[in-house]
Design a protein with these regions (language model features):
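Short, surface-exposed beta-strand/loop micro-motifs that present aromatic residues
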Residues: 301-310, 314
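Hydrophobic (often cysteine-bearing) scaffold residues that line and stabilize catalytic clefts
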Residues: 1, 5, 56, 60, ...
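Short, gly/Ser/Thr-rich active-site loops of penicillin-recognizing serine hydrolases
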Residues: 241, 245, 255, 260-263, ...
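Short, conserved catalytic-motif segment at the N-terminal edge
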Residues: 2-56, 77-79, 128
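Short, glycine/proline-biased beta-turn/loop segments that scaffold the active-site neighborhood
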Residues: 79-94
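Short beta->alpha transition motifs characteristic of CBS
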Residues: 33-41, 297, 318-322
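Active-site SXXK
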Residues: 6-10, 23, 29, 52-81, ...
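Short, surface-exposed loop or secondary-structure junction motifs
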Residues: 41, 94-292
Length: 357
């Protein structure tokens, strides 16, 4: 059944949906399937490899920012209920009641997106510009996916840990998980370029696609991270084991429960801390995935991570697409097809005794 996933990837690459892709699937720490297909760039000659590092955009939010928040909670450095002005005293009155939990669940009321370069006097004024920008909706009123909330969390975490965000990410997340090929601003021949080019039209591998991440010199809480299949699979495997790794406990089981279960009941969308929660009325992971599976997709590149707590199944998809609002729905459809095929293959191979009715 895994060949159905293979065929989907081959078809999408053949139709020029994206140049290259890497996918892994497994259960409770055991990898069951991997596939690497395509090229580093469109119409290119260099094949992607298992070691290829991809710009994962919004997945930065769950690979770096969310775990740093939960590590800070476990160490007593902050609480989800803490308001942002506890750590950032310059927060204006209209944003003083925003909590860490609301930033994590996308219910802060911050604007979904705006370009810092248009409102900040310089990169040093980025936080000020973010705080000056008017709210888009009342604080805590509704779910509205906003990279700006995780961008703000990045600034907040630098205060909490008293170090730059990329240093905190390495010290507390990527190094303990042995994610040795994950980080900001990578270099080398194994980096899949985004569509960003220099003034001479030359592609710039390691330069993130997100404009606000670039304005912040590649390091931000909402975007900018690069990773490869092995490292992203390590992270997904840890989640599927409720925070455990071969070295011991990375996150407590309760912390994983907090991030992976719905925290927005009664609102317009189901969100955990950083993750979207799939529901029967909104099966964003695909109809075959059990309700309460969780994950996140980067809308620009198409990369995604998904975990089913029911049976410990997980899937990681990394790709170097360049989706725009005009074709984003096609990217979402492809991901659902891919995740459905992967989950079906898992069920056929392992039986369906864990599957809900």
């Amino acid at each position: 059944m895994w060949n159905a996933v293979d065929r989907l990837l081959e078809k999408a690459i053949g139709e020029n949906a994206f140049p290259g892709c890497a996918i892994a699937a497994g259960q409770r720490g055991k990898v069951l399937y991997t596939n690497v297909s395509g090229y580093l760039v469109r119409d290119g000659e260099r094949l992607v490899k298992h070691s290829t590092r991809y710009d994962v955009g919004a997945l930065t939010q769950v690979l770096v920012t969310m775990p740093l928040c939960m590590i800070a909670v476990e160490r007593g450095l902050l609480g989800p209920e803490d308001t942002v002005d506890r750590f950032l005293p310059e927060v204006p009155a209209d944003k003083k009641t925003i909590t860490v939990a609301q930033l994590l669940t996308q219910t802060s009321g911050l604007s979904p997106h705006f370009l810092l370069q248009e409102e900040a006097r310089s990169d040093k004024d980025a936080l000020g510009a973010l705080l000056r920008h008017p709210l888009a909706s009342p604080v805590g009123g509704k779910v509205s996916d906003s990279g700006m909330g995780f961008l703000l969390l990045g600034f907040l975490l630098e205060k909490v840990f008293d170090m730059p965000l990329d240093e905190a990410a390495k010290r507390f997340v990527t190094a303990p998980l042995h994610m040795n090929h994950t980080g900001y601003l990578p270099s080398g021949s194994d980096v899949a370029p985004t569509s960003i080019r220099d003034d001479n039209g030359v592609l710039q591998p390691g330069c993130p696609l997100d404009g606000n991440a670039r304005f912040l010199h590649g390091v931000a809480g909402h975007s900018g991270l690069f990773t490869n299949l092995e490292d992203a699979t390590r992270f997904a495997s840890m989640l599927s084991l409720n925070g455990r790794t071969e070295d011991g406990v990375f996150l407590s089981q309760r912390a994983v429960h907090l991030v992976s279960t719905e925290r927005t009941r009664g609102m317009n969308a189901a969100r955990g801390y950083g993750f979207h929660i799939t529901k029967r009325q909104n099966p964003f992971l695909g109809m075959l995935w059990p309700s309460d599976g969780y994950g996140l997709r980067d809308p620009a590149s198409g990369s995604a991570i998904a975990v089913s707590p029911l049976d410990g199944f997980f899937t990681v998809v990394l790709m170097n697409g360049a989706y725009t609002p005009a074709n984003r729905a096609e990217g979402e459809r492809f991901l659902r097809q891919c995740l459905n095929a992967a989950y079906a293959a898992f069920q056929h191979e392992n039986g369906a005794e864990d599957c809900e009715a």
